[in-house]
A protein has these predicted regions:
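Alpha/beta catalytic barrel-like cores
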Residues: 1-70, 75-77, 172-320
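Eukaryote-skewed repeat-based solenoidal scaffolds used as protein-protein interaction platforms
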Residues: 55-215
Length: 320
């Protein structure tokens, strides 16, 4: 189930626009709703959702507009523990299921525990421990994650916990092979999950192959690149010095290197096949190909989770 963090929509100062877009994409499926904590991605109306006044009245009313929304309990630094707990209890009563998102391991755990013990049933909540970007610091982050899980389970043994992280870098240049056009990026999220004890300890989660920091759009020349998801890595093809036609060349190389994408039944694979025959209508920008990577990554993680759950082995070709 996705966690969607709302921020400002381009050319709009109304956070409702972002919610409407999210509801449109999700159709009638449930999703977990949060609000960005990055001030640069707020708009005037989104700041109001974080106000602790009247027990977070603005956020509660906002989340009550659709039955498919599972709200994240807001825990800004300005809020008192009592206000956060009241918010959690009211949301539990109104929505049934709620979520907590622990970003700061030093302050958010206590806020979460105080709220969990005040609920009618702590099992109505899922607790996300969001570790952010983990590449280069896996050992320390693993230890911190285990300690956080232990703190929660000591007080609430029945707590439902999921650990979120991402290892996708902000730049792929350090992962290029000698040709400067392709390379592999190792996926660390699954390794982290196993190191903390696997599914017996926490539910697997990640950032969908998105870097943890959202950068504002920078006007300038881009390098066409297409990324695909493998079992334990992302593979990319990039074409420095080319314009959008570089996506066509990258797609051709991906299908030559990994021909199973010729028959994979996913939207992302279909976009790669289209590009390989020269059809990049509506796909001429990097943002479109990030969406392809996310789609392929999510499909791969669902496949891997099902394999782990049911304990069966795929053919080697299927797990490429």
């Amino acid at each position: 189930m996705p966690v969607i963090s709302l921020g400002k929509w381009p050319r709009s100062e109304e956070i409702q626009v972002s919610l409407d877009k999210s509801l449109e994409v999700m159709s009638n499926l449930p999703f977990i709703l949060d609000v960005t904590k990055d001030n640069s991605h707020h708009c005037a109306s989104s700041f109001e959702l974080l106000s602790p006044e009247n027990g977070f009245k603005n956020w509660i009313e906002f989340c009550s507009r659709n039955d498919n929304i599972i709200p994240v309990v807001q825990m800004p630094d300005s809020a008192k523990l009592r206000d956060i707990s009241i918010q959690a209890r009211v949301l539990e009563e109104l929505k049934g299921s709620i979520a907590f998102r622990i970003r700061n391991l030093n302050t958010d755990i206590n806020k979460t525990l105080t709220s969990l013990v005040s609920m009618n049933s702590p099992e109505n909540a899922i607790v996300f421990i969001d570790l952010g970007y983990i590449r280069g610091n896996v050992s320390a982050i693993t230890a911190a994650a285990i300690n956080s899980i232990n703190q929660i389970r000591t007080e609430i043994p029945e707590a439902i916990i999921s650990v979120l992280a991402t290892s996708f870098p902000s730049s792929v240049t350090n992962f290029c092979r000698e040709n400067g056009q392709s390379g592999y990026i190792d996926v660390i999220e699954r390794e982290l999950h196993q190191n903390i004890g696997g599914s017996d300890v926490a539910i697997y989660g990640d950032h969908g192959s998105i870097h943890s920091v959202v950068y504002d759009n920078i006007i300038g020349r881009y390098v066409p690149r297409i990324d695909i998801a493998l079992n334990d890595s992302w593979y990319f093809e990039r074409r420095p010095g080319m314009n959008k036609e570089g996506f066509i060349e990258a797609a051709k190389s991906i299908l030559a290197e990994y021909p199973h994408y010729q028959r994979e039944d996913s939207w992302g694979a279909a976009m790669i096949r289209n590009a390989a025959i020269g059809d990049i209508a509506g796909m001429g920008s990097p943002a479109k190909w990030i969406a392809v990577r996310v789609n392929l990554h999510l499909n791969k993680q669902i496949e891997l989770s099902e394999a782990l759950q049911y304990g069966f082995d795929h053919d080697e070709e299927d797990l490429i």
